[in-house]
């Protein structure tokens, strides 16, 4: 016989501790994903423009996983170093440099071959969709670099600061 009891105080504590992380996830998802909806609503031929944007964004999203994975490897290292009061500067510099090299090489390469990439992947891929992809790849470099600092702030327990940054990003968007 298995018995299951729920203590309201425990549920309240879990919610209170996890709420900032849930809010951060929501805000980051909202500002990262809402562009397609805004394009569709704001432009005269919004459905077409949102489709072109979505086709280019899929590639950005897939490539951004690499930055996310590197940041995911760094976060526990940052957390351990912060807990042990060790300097995070060397790890931060190495992580930033590695991410900068990877993101600039991938980003610049994708910008240079933007039209060919879009034509190869999509039947409707043309110079216009290539230009959209090119601009998104500029943001790829920035997105990749922010993963490093985001993982450092998360490891340091600075979720409130990340929520403020995400809220400002969402408001600007």
Residue ranges and their predicted role:
Residues 1-32, 42, 73, 77-87:
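Interhelical loop/hinge segments that connect adjacent transmembrane helices in multipass membrane
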Residues 1, 14, 57, 98-111, ...:
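Short alpha-helical transmembrane segments in multi-pass integral membrane proteins
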Residues 60-96, 103, 150-155:
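Helix-loop junctions and terminal segments of transmembrane helices
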Residues 1, 24, 28, 32, ...:
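Short runs within selected transmembrane alpha-helices of multi-pass transporters and secretion channels
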Residues 47, 93, 110-143:
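Interfacial segments at transmembrane-helix termini and the short loops linking adjacent helices
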Residues 40, 53-72, 102-106, 136-143:
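Transmembrane helix-bundle signature of multi-pass secondary active exporters and lipid flippases
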Residues 1, 37, 66-69, 107-112, ...:
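Membrane-embedded alpha-helical segments of multi-pass transporters/permeases
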Residues 26-62, 80, 115-125:
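Helix-terminus/linker motif at the lipid-water interface of multi-pass membrane proteins
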């Amino acid at each position: 016989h298995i018995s299951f009891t729920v203590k309201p105080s425990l549920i309240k504590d879990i919610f209170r501790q996890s709420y900032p992380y849930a809010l951060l996830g929501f805000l980051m998802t909202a500002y990262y994903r809402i562009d397609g909806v805004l394009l569709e609503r704001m432009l005269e031929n919004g459905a077409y423009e949102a489709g072109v944007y979505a086709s280019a964004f899929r590639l950005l999203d897939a490539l951004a996983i690499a930055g996310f994975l590197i940041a995911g490897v760094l976060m526990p290292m940052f957390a351990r170093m912060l807990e042990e009061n060790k300097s995070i500067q060397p790890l931060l510099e190495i992580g930033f440099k590695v991410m900068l090299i990877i993101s600039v090489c991938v980003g610049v390469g994708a910008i240079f071959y933007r039209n060919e990439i879009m034509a190869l992947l999509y039947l409707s891929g043309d110079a216009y969709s290539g230009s959209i992809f090119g601009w998104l790849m500029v943001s790829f470099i920035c997105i990749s670099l922010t993963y490093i600092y985001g993982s450092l702030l998360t490891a340091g327990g600075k979720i409130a600061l990340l929520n403020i940054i995400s809220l400002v990003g969402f408001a600007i968007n």
